[in-house]
């Protein structure tokens, strides 16, 4: 998987979403 600002943002939002909920 290539790391790009877009994928990084999605991954960050995904981890935050799981952490918050």
UniProtKB/Swiss-Prot annotation:
One of its GO terms (cellular component) is plasma membrane-derived thylakoid membrane. It is a peripheral membrane protein. Its main location: membrane. Coiled coil: none annotated. The keyword tRNA processing does not apply. Keywords: Antenna complex, Bile pigment, Chromophore, Electron transport, Membrane, Photosynthesis, Phycobilisome, Thylakoid, Transport. Contains one covalently linked bilin chromophore. GO terms for biological process: photosynthesis. It is found in: Cellular thylakoid membrane. Heterodimer of an alpha and a beta subunit, which further assembles into trimers and the trimers into hexamers. Belongs to the phycobiliprotein family. Light-harvesting photosynthetic bile pigment-protein from the phycobiliprotein complex (phycobilisome, PBS). Phycocyanin is the major phycobiliprotein in the PBS rod. This is C-phycocyanin alpha subunit. It comes from Anabaena sp. (strain L31). The gene is cpcA.
